[in-house]
């Protein structure tokens, strides 16, 4: 059984923080999950916590919740904020997620790269090998096709772009970006495409961003951030830290207005800062509510190309159906080769060498013609969901 358990949409950020996973514990999580499930993929982003699994045994929903909650040491009171989807619903969920239909900012395509990353990590961890691997391969192809054909780059959107565009409209020109992961890199790229006065990039390891040093960008470590934090107009924070990185005491009470966009989950910024008159603080939930002119265009365009999602769902479900009869097909081919070998051997003992070779080709081609037709019929019936009776007849003909 294929399934996914994750945080429900529109759950408050205060709850999502309690369900966030820490990357440093990833190996431990996977190892423990594989004690209960055949395959596992963990999708852990700033806005999404989902565990995709495949189990061979029949297992109740309560058992699934218990096993996963025990691994992550989540409080049972948080179960009401989680969803569980199985079989086709789980497949549909992944295909829609990778195309941006479930993103807090509709159409945001960062999720495609994040799912590709989760898939590659699962391959590296040896935590997928069959059904989940195929499902993610089809999903990634679906996401790429959707992105290309839908041409969402013509109406670009992300939490980063919305935050920075909002700040620029408010007159911000001096920026600080905390963190240089995927989101931080997007923030820097977006800022460099606009006329800003300066950018302070705050990182743990300055060597990882040394190529950015220039007239506009100055790279500092976290110990140096407070030297300039009260001089800037806007902070974009997007670290993976499990703790607060911008504290209430870091920003003075008096001074010019400072806009803070906290894109992290758990939150990077002390929420008490919003009580200071000079601070305008927005977390990821508030950022996703900022209306932008492209929202309606994105929604209409995505609906127009939703057939790509539906085709990918069908592709995977059809693969599963064919896979269910693959062992029967394999046995038929084995039996075909056995019968052909017996007939060829019998003829070879009676005929001359030249005739034997001709007979071998004729026997093999005749057998292939009938066996391949039977296999085509079995596959066709499997796709219709009516393969059991067909398989019974074919087995009686070829395997008894």
From Swiss-Prot:
Which pathway is it part of? Porphyrin-containing compound metabolism; protoporphyrin-IX biosynthesis; 5-aminolevulinate from L-glutamyl-tRNA(Glu): step 1/2
Residues flagged as site, Important for activity: 93
Provide an example Pfam family for this protein: Shikimate_DH
Binding of NADP(+) occurs at 179-184
Report if keyword Ribonucleoprotein is assigned: no
Q: What is its EC number?
A: 1.2.1.70
Q: Which InterPro entries match?
A: 4pyrrol_synth_GluRdtase (IPR000343), 4pyrrol_synth_GluRdtase_dimer (IPR015896), 4pyrrol_synth_GluRdtase_N (IPR015895), GluRdtase_CS (IPR018214), GluRdtase_N_sf (IPR036343), NAD(P)-bd_dom_sf (IPR036291), Shikm_DH/Glu-tRNA_Rdtase (IPR006151)
Give the catalysed reaction(s), semicolon-separated. (S)-4-amino-5-oxopentanoate + tRNA(Glu) + NADP(+) = L-glutamyl-tRNA(Glu) + NADPH + H(+)
Gene3D superfamilies xrefs: Glutamyl-tRNA reductase, N-terminal domain, NAD(P)-binding Rossmann-like Domain
Q: Which GO terms describe its molecular function?
A: glutamyl-tRNA reductase activity; NADP binding
Where is substrate annotated to bind?
Answer: 45-48, 103, 108-110, 114
Q: What class of enzyme is it?
A: oxidoreductase
Q: What does this protein do?
A: Catalyzes the NADPH-dependent reduction of glutamyl-tRNA(Glu) to glutamate 1-semialdehyde (GSA).
Q: Any notes on this protein's domains?
A: Possesses an unusual extended V-shaped dimeric structure with each monomer consisting of three distinct domains arranged along a curved 'spinal' alpha-helix. The N-terminal catalytic domain specifically recognizes the glutamate moiety of the substrate. The second domain is the NADPH-binding domain, and the third C-terminal domain is responsible for dimerization.
UniProt-listed HAMAP family: Glu_tRNA_reductase
Q: What name is this protein filed under?
A: Glutamyl-tRNA reductase
């Amino acid at each position: 059984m294929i399934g996914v358990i994750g945080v429900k949409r529109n759950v408050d950020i205060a709850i999502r923080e309690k369900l966030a996973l820490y990357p440093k514990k990833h190996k431990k999580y996977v190892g423990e999950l594989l004690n209960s499930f055949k395959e596992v993929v963990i999708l852990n982003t700033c806005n999404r916590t989902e565990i995709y699994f495949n189990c061979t045994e029949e297992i109740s929903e309560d058992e699934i919740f218990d096993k996963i909650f025990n691994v992550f040491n989540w409080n049972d009171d948080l179960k009401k904020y989680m969803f569980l989807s199985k079989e086709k619903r789980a497949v549909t969920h992944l295909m829609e997620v990778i195309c941006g239909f479930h993103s807090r900012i509709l159409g945001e395509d960062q999720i495609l790269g994040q799912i590709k990353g989760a898939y590659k990590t699962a391959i590296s961890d040896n935590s997928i090998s069959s059904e989940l691997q195929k499902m993610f391969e089809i999903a990634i192809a679906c996401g790429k096709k959707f992105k290309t054909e839908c041409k969402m780059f013509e109406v670009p959107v992300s939490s980063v772009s919305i935050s920075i565009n909002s700040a620029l409209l408010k007159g911000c020109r001096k920026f600080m970006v905390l963190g240089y992961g995927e989101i931080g890199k997007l923030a820097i790229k977006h800022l460099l495409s606009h006329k800003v006065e300066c950018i302070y990039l705050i990182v743990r390891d300055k060597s990882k961003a040394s190529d950015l040093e220039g007239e506009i960008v100055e790279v500092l470590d976290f110990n140096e951030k407070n030297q300039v934090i009260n001089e800037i107009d806007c902070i974009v924070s997007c670290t993976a830290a499990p703790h607060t990185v911008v504290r209430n005491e870091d920003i003075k009470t008096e001074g010019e207005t400072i806009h803070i966009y906290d894109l992290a989950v758990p939150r990077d910024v002390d929420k008490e800062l919003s009580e200071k008159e000079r601070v305008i603080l927005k977390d990821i939930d508030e950022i996703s509510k900022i209306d932008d002119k492209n929202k309606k265009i994105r929604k209409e365009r995505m609906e127009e190309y939703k057939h790509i999602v539906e085709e990918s769902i069908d592709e995977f479900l059809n693969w599963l159906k064919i896979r269910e009869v693959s062992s029967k097909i394999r046995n038929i081919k084995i039996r075909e080769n056995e019968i052909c070998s017996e007939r060829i051997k019998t003829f070879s003992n009676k005929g001359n060498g030249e005739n034997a070779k001709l007979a071998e080709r004729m026997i093999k081609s005749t057998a292939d013609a009938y066996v391949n037709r039977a296999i085509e019929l079995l596959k066709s019936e499997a796709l219709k969901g009516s393969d059991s009776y067909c398989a019974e007849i074919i087995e009686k003909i070829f395997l008894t």
